[in-house]
């Protein structure tokens, strides 16, 4: 089996795993453990690019989780105005996605600011991570539009994004894990060839 097939199967399995768990706390913990593994791999093998990408992803995940899971951002009660709550929640997640896109677009400059390592280079994967957050941003824009149509205009049957929102998030997390694991596999494979 080729590496590409293994990675594709891993990503699909992770999406299915996340959907079955359907618990943000457990998924967050699992995601952080994957990021920690990747960070440790990068640190042990002196690969600052992997370390920095893992740290950036962890920073974004912890920031988002801290805002929503700890109650800093109120997810609303039964009798709240869902238009306002949804706009705040999806709007804040859109802002986090925009921040993440900028973080990964300027990843090299940020990495060089914090480290003087000569190994900090543009990797083949630097052009991919920000696209995951662009995709997440598009989902958040669609969620904002749907929230406005449903709660401001009374289109209460319009719930496609709302019903599948977590699945999109799980897929993006799984793709992120897949990209990181691919980076690790290629580093190991390239090291064996040299």
Range-by-range predicted roles:
Residues 15-21, 66-79, 145-157:
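Juxtamembrane "helix-exit" motif on the non-cytosolic side of transmembrane helices
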Residues 33-43, 59-65, 95:
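Alpha-helical transmembrane segments and their membrane-interface exit regions
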């Amino acid at each position: 089996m080729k590496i590409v097939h293994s990675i594709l199967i891993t990503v699909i399995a992770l999406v299915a795993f996340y959907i079955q768990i359907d618990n943000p706390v457990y998924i967050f913990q699992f995601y952080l453990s994957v990021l920690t593994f990747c960070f440790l791999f990068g640190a042990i093998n002196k690969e600052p690019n992997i370390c920095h990408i893992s740290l950036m992803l962890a920073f974004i995940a912890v920031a988002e989780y801290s805002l929503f899971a700890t109650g800093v951002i109120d997810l609303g009660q039964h009798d709240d105005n869902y238009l306002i709550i949804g706009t705040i929640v999806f709007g804040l997640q859109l802002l986090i996605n925009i921040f993440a896109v900028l973080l990964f677009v300027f990843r090299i400059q940020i990495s060089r600011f914090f480290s003087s390592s000569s190994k900090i280079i543009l990797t083949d994967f630097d052009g991919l991570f920000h696209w995951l957050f662009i995709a997440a941003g598009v989902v958040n824009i669609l969620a904002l539009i749907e929230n406005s149509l449903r709660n401001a205009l009374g289109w209460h049957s319009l719930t496609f994004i709302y019903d599948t929102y977590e699945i999109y998030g799980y897929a993006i997390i799984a793709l992120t894990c897949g990209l990181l694991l691919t980076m690790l596999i290629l580093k190991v494979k390239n090291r064996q060839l040299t």
